[in-house]
Amino acid sequence: MKKLFFFTCLLAAVQYNSAQVTFTPQSAGTNYTDRGFVDMNGDGLDDILSVSNSNIQVLYQQQDGSFVESIVSTTFADISPSWSLAAADYDRNGQTDLLYGGGNGVTFMRANDDGTQYTEISGTEYVFSQRSNFVDINNDGHLDAYVCHDVEPSVFYINDGEGNLEYFQGGLGDYPSGGHYGSVWLDFDNDRDIDMFIAKCGGESERRDNEMHVNNGDGTFTESGASLNLEDDMQTWSSAWADYDNDGDLDGWVGASTFNSGFHRLMRNNGNGTFTDVINASGLTGFNVTSIENQTYDFDNHGNADIVSGGVILYGNGDLTFTISSTNIGNGGFGDINEDGFVDAISNGQLIINNTNNNNWLKINTIGVESNIDGIGARIEITTASGTQLREVRSGEGFRNMSTLNTHFGLGLDQEIESVTIYWPSGIIDVFDDLEINTTHSIVEGQSALNTGEFLTSDLSVFPVPALNNLTVSNIQDIEDPVYTVFDVSGRKVMQGRLLNNNIDVSQLTSGQYILRISGQKFRRNNVKATKFTKR
């Protein structure tokens, strides 16, 4: 291994929180196809990743700003990541594994316990890969994988808990001739389970109808694009989802790859199970760039989510309007490659270094215990004097590259954080007060010692007891927009969803004792109740 130092020229910092930022390009020092930024060794720092069929090059970021280079020769991969790459620690050994999505199939590169060797695992199935993701599809605490298929129904790989992945096709993106291009996993309906949007492309209109697969909370999904007003037959390869108006739910930017079938879409989440296209009021009707790459970060740390589409930054104003910048940072992966709290990029062998400003920031590195070790699927909300922001942990955004698994928040000129709330996929909720700003915090699931038993109350009523098929809940009129979570006696989450008409279908539960927790969509300690119940 060799130690490398990268230097860049910093511009003078600005004094106000709405300033756009500039960027300085420099060599990335990569030898192969650069595929993004991701923490490869579990130290919380983003590293530079470059791969070929027979080599994996990692430039490990150090605390002093230098990089230690490692090049590992691998068994020749049957499939190269010619279409996409995803990364995560799917076998929970502390080292990041890779998924190569190619034109003929899928290869997994499984890291050993110190990242010095990789085991090449390639299936025999034909997959014309597009976007790929690591995600816990069945929420059993183990990361699965998903790959969009261009010409057939999409495929996924279920983790058996020992790091072995079983291939499945169909059920999540089923159009017979495919057209599945850009998958992103998100919780759009605030019921605390993970849904999936697929940006689609194709010759005939039906093949390119965008899809939203809604998690039913029981391991199944229902494609609901039409009822949500998201089934659009524009040509698109990827989308970018964030809370662009800071109202507590995720909105969607669906970027057009060509204008032959329609313009860009900016879909406002109405909070009632529908979306409305607000592109005409967004300030983006003059944005005539088309691209296959769309992602979202807060590049200037002003506290609002921005969009990067085709390399052009669209600065968010926090109200679903945007300012088109003259900055183009290329299509690639994103992360903080010099630990200064500002988002950088990698594209075509160059690091695109953010020259920063005076705004403050916070980063969270999630470490799952009951949930998957990377915390993928977790939602993080922070509250400051300026309001509440939310982010989600995702593996595989945009179309082709891999970006950081750390969640990044710009704070503007706010000097304090009132609270940080992490909703883990397991159902565990961590709440922290007064975390230090301008710092990366590595948070272990359950670290805040906030658990379900703490909230057992005498004023939450359920009947009948024992319950057979349905459980009715009462005395929750003080909880706004209630969400229910059911845990078994070991503390494992077994059900979750929005509470509708004070009724929960428990027919699928096995007989035994359970804990029911009711909380508001915006979690507060004084806004949660829990009780035990019996299923017969």
Predicted regions and their residues:
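Gly/Ser/Thr/Pro-enriched helix-cap/hinge segments flanking short amphipathic alpha-helices
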Residues: 23-27, 322-457
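An edge-strand/N-cap motif at the start of beta-rich repeat modules
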Residues: 18-50, 63-65, 94-96, 141-143
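C-terminal outer-membrane/trafficking sorting elements
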Residues: 385-390, 415, 421-423, 454-536
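Bacterial Sec-dependent N-terminal signal peptides
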Residues: 1-21, 452, 513, 527-530
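Blade-edge motifs of beta-propeller repeat domains
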Residues: 19-33, 60-81, 109-127, 158-178, ...
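Glycine-aliphatic tripeptides that mark coil-to-beta-strand junctions in extracellular
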Residues: 42-46, 94-98, 141-147, 192-198, ...
